[in-house]
């Protein structure tokens, strides 16, 4: 990294002095900003919406929504009313009670946000699903969570295998002309009849409110449960890291199927009473730059992949738009390349602030802040109230510049509460000494900045999304031509990594480009488009351990011309 440190930004930031705040901050201070600190009545969705609707912010715009067909805005008062309506629909027609799982499987739209907030208001645990998921991925998540209700659209309805999900009692369909039946309910018709007044279910701090499924390198996706207490850290990171101010227009580009789109696309901004922008439809530079110009976006949270795609569109494209409203730009999902930081400085005249966290942590943990110098390529420093370290495999802290496990001291407010139906997996995240081990390798420099070095396991980060190789391999071997498959992440200048599959064919099948395309489509239709291999290489056989596990590190060594390391466990 030959880029010089970018100096702290002058200005009236919410986090004024990092070192001083880090020394003295206590999470109890953050609790004072919530109505439940006085009333004892606690619900994250109430705090995000109703608290403002019952204050001087009631007529403030909470949501700007736009896509190719819709251009709408909703005040906090209207958000309260529409989410109340959604809560009443789920209660009356879905028999939803406290603790029930309600999954939302639909593209971005205002209704998605009304329904998620309404579900949480009545005590349900909301589970967002990415719209690109195919039947197999949807079934796995609904089955594991024992979801009682799923909300979808007519286009996605056929991907929900209702007859294979005995716990699923009701399917609500939003938009279109879906006929209500035994367990299919037309949401739009039901919502018209419902009151905008709702009896809110008051919760305890440790009651669940969000269930996000995340991929690992082995096993099926795991359900990470977050509890209402997480709102404390979601609020505080919105204040410090996003640096949200009363007058800000804020845009997080992430889909709510991913944890960033929920935590930083819903809760952090609205807990802070900010105006939130949601853009539906596909990415295009014209749409994105046009949104910033049209709505006067001040704070923008996106991902390195998106920034690289904007880079690819050329500086001339950016120059066509007035982007001077931007005050603060942030990135998440994968390490931020120095060339993207350089480009951001040139095109926006702004620093891009990298942030690090993961589904399991529930909110940002290690970040770059406006009040602090940025070392390009560094993750930054831990937020006040969080202790981070580099530890060895026994949990001993390592000195500066020694690479090891990136670990966080247990007990921050947004830490996952459990892994759904898998307490043993939850316990496996922790080391002696109370350390949560992230699965990332990193080192810390002498000034306390952390530097990401890669995944300890094999999870693939493609376009900012985590893809578990095991899930892709499992789908691949369902194809009749495939005997065995191994999947790795291959470095890519635009997407960070792409998925590459090594495949051994069954007897009677011959390698061909036509077969590659058929296999790619098979995974796309069975899992999701982003999970389909972009490269496929046929092999006579794949390297395996004696117990039969594919040795992905050997595949990666083949691909990148690296030493394969210890091969003592490989079968002959």
From Swiss-Prot:
EC number: 6.2.1.1
Disruption phenotype: Disruption of this gene induces a loss of the ability to utilize acetate as a carbon source for growth or sporulation.
GO biological process: one example: acetyl-CoA biosynthetic process
Chief location bin: membrane
Subcellular location: Cell membrane; Membrane raft
Catalytic activity: acetate + ATP + CoA = acetyl-CoA + AMP + diphosphate
Single GO term (MF): acetate-CoA ligase activity
N6-acetyllysine PTM sites in chain numbering: 549
Post-translational modification as stated in the protein's UniProt record: Acetylated. Deacetylation by the SIR2-homolog deacetylase activates the enzyme.
Record keywords, A-Z: Acetylation, ATP-binding, Cell membrane, Ligase, Magnesium, Membrane, Metal-binding, Nucleotide-binding
CDD domains cross-referenced by the UniProt entry: MACS_like_4 (cd05969)
Residues bound to Mg(2+): 477, 479, 482
UniProt: ATP binding residues: 333-335, 354-359, 440, 455, 466
Cofactor(s), by name: Mg(2+)
List of residues binding CoA: 260, 463, 524
GO cellular component: cytosol; membrane raft; plasma membrane
Described purpose of this protein according to its UniProt entry: Catalyzes the conversion of acetate into acetyl-CoA (AcCoA), an essential intermediate at the junction of anabolic and catabolic pathways. AcsA undergoes a two-step reaction. In the first half reaction, AcsA combines acetate with ATP to form acetyl-adenylate (AcAMP) intermediate. In the second half reaction, it can then transfer the acetyl group from AcAMP to the sulfhydryl group of CoA, forming the product AcCoA. Has a role in growth and sporulation on acetate.
Oligomer status and interactors: Interacts with FloT.
NCBIfam families: PRK04319.1
PANTHER family: ACETYL-COENZYME A SYNTHETASE, ACETYL-COENZYME A SYNTHETASE 1
Entry's family note: Belongs to the ATP-dependent AMP-binding enzyme family.
Protein's name according to its UniProt entry: Acetyl-coenzyme A synthetase
Native organism: Bacillus subtilis (strain 168)
């Amino acid at each position: 990294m030959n880029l010089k440190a970018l100096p702290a930004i002058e200005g009236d930031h919410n986090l004024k002095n990092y070192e001083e705040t880090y020394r003295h901050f206590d999470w109890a201070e953050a609790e004072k900003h919530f109505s439940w600190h006085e009333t004892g009545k606690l619900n994250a969705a109430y705090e995000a919406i109703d608290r403002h609707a019952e204050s001087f912010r009631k007529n403030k715009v909470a949501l700007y929504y736009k896509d190719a067909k819709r251009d709408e805005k909703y005040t906090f008062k209207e958000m309260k009313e529409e989410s109340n309506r959604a809560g009443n629909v789920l209660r009356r027609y879905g028999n939803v009670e406290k603790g029930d799982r309600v999954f939302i499987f639909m593209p971005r739209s205002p209704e998605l946000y009304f329904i998620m907030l309404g579900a949480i208001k009545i005590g349900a645990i909301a589970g967002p699903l990415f719209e690109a998921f195919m039947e197999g991925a949807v079934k796995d998540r609904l089955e594991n969570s024992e979801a009682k209700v799923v909300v979808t659209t007519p286009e996605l309805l056929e991907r929900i295998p209702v007859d294979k999900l005995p716990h699923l009692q009701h399917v609500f369909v939003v938009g279109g002309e879906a006929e209500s039946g035994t367990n299919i309910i037309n949401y739009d018709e039901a919502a018209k009849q419902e009151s905008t007044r709702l009896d809110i279910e008051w919760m305890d701090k440790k009651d669940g409110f969000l269930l996000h499924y995340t991929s690992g390198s082995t096993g099926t996706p795991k359900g990470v449960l977050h509890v209402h207490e997480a709102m404390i850290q979601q609020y505080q990171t919105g204040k410090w890291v996003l640096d949200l101010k009363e007058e800000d227009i804020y845009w997080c580009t992430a889909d709510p199927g991913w944890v960033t789109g929920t935590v930083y696309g819903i809760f952090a901004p609205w807990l802070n009473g900010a105006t939130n922008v949601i853009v539906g439809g596909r990415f295009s530079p014209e749409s994105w730059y046009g949104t910033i110009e049209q709505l006067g976006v001040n704070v923008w949270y996106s991902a390195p992949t998106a920034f690289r795609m904007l880079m690819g569109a050329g500086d001339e494209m950016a120059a066509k738009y007035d982007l001077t409203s931007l005050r603060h730009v942030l990135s998440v999902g994968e390490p931020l390349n120095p060339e993207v930081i350089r480009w951001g400085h040139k095109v926006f005249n702004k620093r891009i602030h990298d942030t690090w966290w993961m589904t399991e942590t529930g909110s940002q943990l290690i970040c770059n802040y406006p009040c602090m110098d940025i070392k390009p390529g560094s993750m930054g420093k831990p937020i006040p109230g969080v202790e981070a370290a580099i530890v060895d495999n026994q949990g001993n802290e390592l000195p500066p510049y020694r690479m090891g496990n990136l670990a966080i001291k247990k007990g921050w407010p947004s830490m996952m509460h459990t892994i759904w139906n898998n307490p043993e997996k939850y316990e496996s995240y922790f080391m002696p000494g109370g350390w949560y081990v992230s699965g990332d390798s990193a080192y810390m420099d002498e000034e306390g900045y952390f530097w990401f070095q890669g995944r300890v396991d094999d999870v693939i980060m493609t376009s900012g999304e985590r893809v578990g190789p095991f899930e892709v391999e499992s789908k691949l071997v369902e194809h009749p031509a495939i005997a065995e498959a191994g999947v790795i992440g291959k470095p890519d200048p635009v997407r960070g990594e792409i998925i590459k599959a090594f495949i051994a064919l069954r007897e009677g099948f011959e390698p061909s480009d036509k077969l590659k395309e058929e296999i790619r489509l098979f995974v796309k239709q069975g899992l999701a488009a982003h999970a389909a291999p972009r490269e496929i290489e046929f092999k006579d056989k794949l390297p395996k351990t004696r117990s039969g596990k594919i040795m992905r590190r050997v595949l990666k060594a083949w691909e990148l011309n690296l030493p394969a390391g210890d091969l003592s466990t490989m079968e002959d």
